[in-house]
Amino acid sequence: YDIIDSKGNKNIHCYANCDGLVLSNGDILAVASCRANSGYRDLPEDAGIELRRSTDNGVTWSEPVKIYQGVNWEPFLLELPTGELHCYFTDSSRTGLEGHDTDTGTAMVVSADGGKTWSPDFSSSPYYVLRMRWEKNGIVGYNHQMPSVVRLNDNKGLAAAVETNNSGYHISLCYSDKDEWEYLAADQEGPADSNNCVFSGMGPYLGQFPSGETVLSYESSSKYTLKIGDATARNFGSAYQPFSGGYWGSLCMIDSHTLVGTNVKVKEGPVQMAQFVLNHRIDAVKREVTVDGNNKEWANTDHALFVGSKSQAQGTLR
């Protein structure tokens, strides 16, 4: 929509990079980066992150509330078991090197009341948490952007997947053994427990199944790519590319064995979407049954094993 920006000029207020999260109380939060369309890099007062809330499964939404002010991209929401909320985002040009290759980093704001209020204060600098130092032609800058963060199972802390633009685009992984990060200065690198530029890729998303397997999605050679990792998100297997091409995919964990992956073909427009099922060992369920043609003994058995292929010889075993 039309605005008069902070420099007194006519401009357009626009949005990008929406992320959503269903809270433990059932509320849905949606956040998006916002900015003035023209000259946004020099208009931090007109940029920020806006949040909307739905309490009726997305039927209606609250008015937008700005929770952060400043130039940013790709906000990402995480809820901890305590109810604390993290909103991570790509922080732009804190060291003033815009135009010299890339100068970003991941920052965050935090809410302790379900997203009603956030800290640091609205117009204050955010918490800097994920940053890699780079140097090129005598110029020093920082990177780690497009964050996706999970709380690892069994209280093993946090794992983050980020994109690093350093002589090409790479996937980097950062870790904390607690449910928090060390807060850094704008010109400080961290965390110490990081595996930078692990392999080529862009735009990562990270998830974990209850059984421990982590899943990483990212873009590689214009294709949506998935890798299965271990319970610590430190070791990943072979790449799997299920879609025909496109950019800027994501993933969402649906249940104990299922995730949904999405990818968009930016030039053509359509969104590609598929459901992926985790294939791993399933413990057989033991039941005492009465042979009477009634399956009531299996009513509470969720695990099913499909046997067969594209033929008439198929069956589902429980």
Where would I find each of the regions flagged by the language model?
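Order/disorder boundary and secretion-linked terminal/linker segments
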Residues: R281-R318
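Asp-box/BNR beta-propeller blade signature and adjacent active/binding-site loops
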Residues: Y1-R281
